[in-house]
Design a protein with these regions (language model features):
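Long, low-complexity, charged/polar intrinsically disordered regions in eukaryotic proteins
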Residues: 82-139
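Amphipathic alpha-helical interaction segments
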Residues: 117, 121, 155-159, 200
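Accessory beta->alpha helical hairpin/"wing" motif in late/C-terminal subdomains of nucleic-acid enzymes
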Residues: 104-118, 165, 181, 186, ...
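Long, low-complexity intrinsically disordered regions enriched in small/polar
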Residues: 1-51, 55
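Extended, charge-enriched "interface" segments that sit outside catalytic cores
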Residues: 61
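N-terminal leader regions that mediate targeting or early regulatory function
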Residues: 64, 68-90
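Intrinsically disordered, low-complexity segments
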Residues: 363-370
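Short amphipathic alpha-helical interface segments
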Residues: 135-181
Length: 370
């Protein structure tokens, strides 16, 4: 926006007049203008309210805006979304939902949904999910949202650490943050979420047991690996040397120290690995990170192929993995709940954005939803 400041000119009789003009250029929308737009969008909703409801609605909407705008200010260019008509309509819907609820957590949840709209606004399916989610924030029961968020976290988040114990500790810490209340039993919460279009219940079958699900999605944690002091062990060490890879990429298997394994959650993670080298030049530490070459990736795949696949050994490793899950209090709590969910279900686009927004509210460090 370009705005002209007030102009002033003074001159004596017969003298030349020179006009000074200041041009103020404003790039984008600042906090003040963002709040003005919010106020303009809420004006229509205010007109629909009775005198008795007016004060409560204004207070709630103000709490919502005070949660939203500081979050948007932390994201480069996010306030410019207020110039988008589609975002303004979404703000208007969020105002109606905020005015209808007195749960403080709902204001934070609405904020996270709008932030997600800014960050993933090019995907029409996501936009549709967010729009519907904004409408039902005030309708979803606390325990249903909790269950939705925990089930979403089970399916969405896996650790990246190559260490089995560290990876499970990360999950345990996550569920400590997400399980802010007692998880629901029975099927009422499922019916409730199905009515709100957050899930689609399947009346055929049950969810796979949590420990089995994690064993499948984190296969690098449930391998035996290569037994020490064997021919395959020597072969693996030689392959690492020939490929110029550090021997530290092979670690003791925490579930059986007779074996070593690649420090990976899954074989697919090989393609995302990189090597970091540290050099000291003129007293300064220089750190360089490079992607693995195709040959190095192939070498790690060849080492994976050397793993012991004896069925009885793998069953023993898997049993130890299950034990490590129940040895962590929050994972044990989620496992006991998950394994007793009465029926299988699929989370819809609406449910995913709701669950993600609530999870981010509990743990802001979580990655954004793709």
């Amino acid at each position: 926006m370009i705005r002209k400041a007030k102009q002033s000119q003074k001159a004596g009789d017969g003298s030349n007049q020179y006009q000074a003009e200041t041009i103020i250029v404003q790039n984008g929308i600042d906090e003040k203008r963002a709040r003005e737009i919010c106020n303009e969008m809420f004006a229509a909703t205010r007109r629909e309210l009775s005198e008795e409801a007016y004060d409560a609605a204004c207070r709630r909407v103000n709490e919502f805006e005070n949660d939203l705008i500081p979050k948007m200010q932390k994201i480069d260019g996010a306030l410019d979304a207020f110039a988008d008509p589609a975002f303004q309509f979404l703000i208007a819907d969020a105002h109606k939902t905020a005015a209808s609820t007195d749960r403080p957590a709902d204001y934070s949840l609405l904020s996270e949904l709008l932030i997600h709209r800014i960050q993933r606004g090019q995907n029409r399916a996501t936009i549709a999910g967010i729009s519907r989610a904004v409408e039902i924030v005030d309708e979803i029961a606390d325990v249903a949202l909790l269950a939705l968020s925990v089930s979403f976290a089970v399916e969405q988040y896996n650790p990246t650490s190559g260490s089995i114990f560290q990876g499970l500790d990360v999950l345990d810490s996550l569920f400590e943050k997400l399980c802010y209340a007692e998880l629901p039993s029975g099927s009422m919460w499922l019916d409730h979420l199905d009515i709100l279009d957050a899930i689609r219940m399947s009346h055929f079958g049950k969810l796979k047991k949590l420990e089995e699900y994690y064993a499948e999605t984190m296969p690098g944690y449930c391998v035996a690996g290569i037994k020490k002091d064997t021919e395959n062990y020597a072969k693996a060490q030689q392959l690492l040397v020939e490929a110029g890879l550090p021997s530290t990429i092979m670690v003791n298997n925490e579930l059986d120290n007779q074996y070593v394994r690649l420090a990976l959650v899954s074989r697919e993670r090989i393609s995302s690995l990189s090597l970091t080298s540290v050099r000291i030049i003129d007293g300064q530490t220089i750190q360089t990170t490079t992607k693995l070459t195709a040959d190095q990736e192939k070498t790690l795949g060849d080492i994976w192929n050397l793993y012991d696949n004896d069925a009885s050994t793998l069953e023993r490793i898997k049993a130890q993995f299950y034990h490590e899950i129940i040895n962590r209090p929050n994972l044990r709590k989620v496992q006991a709940w998950w394994n007793n969910v009465p029926t299988a279900f699929n989370t819809t686009a609406v449910g995913k954005v709701l669950a993600h927004a609530n999870a981010k509210r509990c743990d802001p460090s979580l990655p954004d939803l793709n």
